[in-house]
Each structure stands twice: as structure tokens, then as C-alpha cells.
């Protein structure tokens, strides 16, 4: 058997990184959020956590089918959702209930 290694495509992925691996913030890229917006996002994170705990309890009681927790991912889901425009699309997965709630 002969193994052939061949490059069929090369590409790069561009991304924006506000916070680097060492926790340093790029102040130019830091979003400008008002106190009201920050409070709204926090309230949504609390709502997501509350829903998550309720759904997990219902699953353990046999009242709903399989449920995978969002716990620990609230900020990433609410923050990502907050950055969407009204005409943007979202394709949620099994641990994306937080994005749907936000």
C-alpha cells in the first residue's frame, strides 16, 4: 500500500481578537457598551442560567427528553447574540438554548 500526501487547497482564516491568550485587551477593539447595555446582558445571562437549571431538573424528572446544559457558556452565548444584526442568521446546536433565549 502506498500513501500519497497531496495538498489540495490552502486557505487562511481571518479573525478579530479583543482579548489575547494572556488576558490583555486591545482597547481599540473593545466594544463601547453603556451601563444599561451591560445590565441587560447580565440579566439575560441570569435568565439563561435559570432556564438551564429548570430544564435540567425537568430532564432528570423525566418530564422532557435529553437536555445538555449551557452552564458556563452563558456569557459567550449572550455576547454573541448581542453582536448580531436583525438580518443575521443563527444556527443553534444542542447547547445553544442560551443564544435562543437572549
Residue ranges and their predicted role:
Residues 50-53, 57-102:
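Cofactor-binding active-site loop characterized by glycine-rich and histidine/acidic residues
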Residues 34-43:
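Short, contiguous, helix-prone interaction/anchoring segments in small proteins
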Residues 20-21, 33-34, 57-59:
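A short alpha-helix capping/helix-coil boundary motif
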Residues 1-30:
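Charged, compositionally biased N-terminal leader segments and the immediate start
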Residues 10-11, 16-20, 43-56:
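N-terminal glycine-rich anion-binding loops that anchor highly charged ligand groups
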